[in-house]
Curated annotation (Swiss-Prot):
Glycans are attached at N64. GO terms for cellular component: host cell endoplasmic reticulum-Golgi intermediate compartment; virion component. Causes the redistribution of lumenal ER protein to an enlarged ERGIC compartment. It is found in: Virion; Host endoplasmic reticulum-Golgi intermediate compartment. It comes from African swine fever virus (isolate Portugal/Lis 57/1957). This is Protein MGF 110-4L-B. Disulfide bonds: none annotated. Transmembrane segments: none annotated. InterPro entries: ASFV_fam_110 (IPR004848).
Amino acid sequence: MLVIFLGILGLLANQVLGLPTQAGGHLRSTDNPPQEELGYWCTYMESCKFCWACAHGICKNKVNMSMPLIIENSYLTSCEVSRWYNQCTYSEGNGHYHVMDCSDPVPHNRPHRLLMKIYEKEDL
């Protein structure tokens, strides 16, 4: 009975968070998550390269339009994300992992914001 309840709760959490339920709600490790999930992944780890569109060294956030334009630098991280049941994981590719409960997410942006270089017109 408890297993059925937890399963239903997991499906409801996926619907509330906008995470699709394909393949049992699992997402294999990828550096290119589905477009419809970018809003979720890029909210909690905004320094992932897949969250930004870059051209000529200037980058714009694909999800959060209030983010400033930035200069492409070490702030952007090659991330891989995965989801197994209700555990969401970000891998930064350098042995650092951020693991969180998908239905109770915790942002992991602060350590990376220290490296962000905001684009100024004078930078051209």
